[in-house]
């Protein structure tokens, strides 16, 4: 009886580990397929930098600090630029 229980638990543990590893591999392969080329990422970075610095300059003319929430998607406004958090 103990041997059967140990065998069942071992099999269940192996199944869980195998499933987790398979999900990780699938997620990695999807990330690699969906990723943007470096040139497109650079264009997005430049656009965010421009938007943030322009909005910060407008805010500063009114003697206000740069709005931190102006940059989105893991970016924040710092020194009149959008920087990756």
UniProtKB/Swiss-Prot annotation:
Its source organism is Cyriopagopus hainanus
Cited InterPro entries? Hwtx-2-like (IPR012625)
Any S-S bridges, and between which cysteines? Answer: 52-66, 56-77, 71-82
Name the UniProt record assigns to this protein: U4-theraphotoxin-Hhn1c
The record's keywords, sorted A to Z, are:
Disulfide bond, Neurotoxin, Postsynaptic neurotoxin, Secreted, Signal, Toxin
In which family does this protein belong, per the annotation? Belongs to the neurotoxin 12 (Hwtx-2) family. 02 (Hwtx-2) subfamily.
Residue positions assigned to the propeptide: 23-48
Report the subcellular localization: Secreted
Give the tissue specificity.
Expressed by the venom gland.
- According to the record, the signal peptide region is 1-22
Domain of life of the native organism: Eukaryota
- Per its database record, what is this protein's job? Postsynaptic neurotoxin.
Q: Report the GO molecular function annotations.
A: toxin activity
The record's section on Pfam families has: Toxin_20
Quote the cellular component terms of the Gene Ontology held in the record.
extracellular region; host cell postsynaptic membrane
């Amino acid at each position: 009886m103990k041997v059967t229980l140990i065998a069942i638990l071992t099999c269940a543990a192996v199944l869980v580990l195998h499933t987790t590893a398979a999900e990780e591999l699938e997620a990695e392969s999807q990330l690699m397929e969906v990723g943007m080329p470096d040139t497109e990422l650079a264009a997005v970075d430049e656009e965010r930098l421009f938007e943030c610095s322009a909005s910060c300059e407008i805010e500063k003319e009114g003697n206000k600090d740069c709005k931190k929430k102006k940059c989105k998607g893991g970016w924040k406004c710092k020194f009149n630029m959008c920087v990756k958090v």
